[in-house]
Amino acid sequence: GLVGSEMCIRDRKCGREVYPSISTAILVLVRKEDSLLLVHARNFKGTFNSLVAGFLETGETLEECVAREVKEETGLDVTNITYFGNQAWPYPSGLMVGFIADYAGGEIKLQEEELSSGDFYTRDNLPELPRKLSLARKMIDWWLECSHK
């Protein structure tokens, strides 16, 4: 049998300990003048729009992951990538790490397998947003607060 704890699962017979792997994902709020980039992923359950997100690959830094995911999913380049915060993410046992980045160039060309829509929005024409408790919504609310000043 297995005995569980918060950190690991231990096999009672052989004593082997198994630590769950953690999947790290990034979330990035891309700013362009007085607008922010919002996308709708095909796997979203609902009609809301959110921020570009993706999983960290072995051997890359979090900042490299941010730049790669934005480029892959939208065709855009970003700069001034800065840490915002993080949130435990229950599925698939992960950690979501949020970043803010500035638009650096390119035209939006969506990765159609992943995204059904994406565009820059000003505070006056925002589409439906993610739920309040999500890291994405906290980041968007922060941007709304900052862009108002």
PLM regions with names:
Residues C8-C14, C65:
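Disulfide-bonded cysteines in secreted/extracellular proteins and peptides
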Residues R12-L51, F55-L56, D77-V78, A101-Y103:
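N-terminal strand-loop-strand
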Residues Q87-K109:
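Active-site-adjacent beta-strand/loop module that shapes the phosphate/pyrophosphate-binding cleft
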